[in-house]
Amino acid sequence: MPICIQNDLPVKNTLLEEGVIVIEENRAKNQDIRPLNILILNLMPKKEETERQLLRLLGNSPIQIKVEFLHVATHQAKNTANSYLKKFYTTFDQIKDKFYDALIITGAPIEHLEFEEVNYWKELQSIFEWSKTHVFSTLNICWAAQASLYHHFGIKKEQVDAKIFGVFEHDVLIENHSLTRGFTDSFLAPHSRHTKIEEEKLSAIPELDVLARSEDVGTLLLATKDLRKIFITGHIEYEADTLQNEYLRDKNSNLPIEVPYNYYPNDDDTKTPQNTWRGVAYLFYHNWINQVYQLTPYDLKELAK
């Protein structure tokens, strides 16, 4: 089934070229189908890149999905024109009375700041609280995962000495869990972060299940037992060249950066990197969407009861 997006969203043509099935809003309105309504809070600087990465994965589902994009109103975007945000994005004030089957909150390159120093922290806290009664399942990615764990459970992030940067091997910890169904026992996934969460703090919270972790970089995937909150500390949505673009950006700016671990063939940054995590990314999003479809109330207003 297709994803339903705004008719003239710029990434639409790229998705169509890749074979992603897209349906325009005008056509979807004439279909007697209850789609899954998913809101994406995009905190990344390069909005279109993140849109493309997430829509590609959501579009692999057999379930029709209607997607809306949200941006924080208390932050002035530096890399995206206001006209683009006004046309394709909404604000929290505009949607806070609506209900959604799922919410995705992306990462953000602001790990050097304490959460309270982030200029949109209070707005994000409001969104976290709102999601308890207006969203069935929230998927938090990288920085958003750390922010959500801090807000909901009081777990603080910790700075690491060297950036966790590359493609690492992970092990599935809970067999036959609905989110990791079909995963191989071990799999690869990329990370790009300067902070971590102490695993002892996660294991001390009975409400949380750690589903996948790495001996090298710690926990990758965890979720509350009711699947209302899901956390990914890495970036399985990344494209093959995303880590390369980050690496070259920092290298060309003379910033301290190592070659991404286990990314380039033979660790040679003149060679073309391969996407070795694509399968697990598609499978995870397929599993998550399937669980949302199975468990979300048909009448989303029941979430507020």
Predicted feature residues:
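Amide-donor transfer/coupling interface in amidating biosynthetic enzymes
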Residues: M1-T74, Y89-T90, I95, F99, ...
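Short, glycine/acidic-enriched capping/hinge loops at junctions between secondary-structure elements
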Residues: T50-Q53, N79-N82, F115-E116
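Helical hinge/lid and interdomain linker segments adjacent to catalytic or ligand-binding clefts
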Residues: L85, Y89-F92, A108, F115
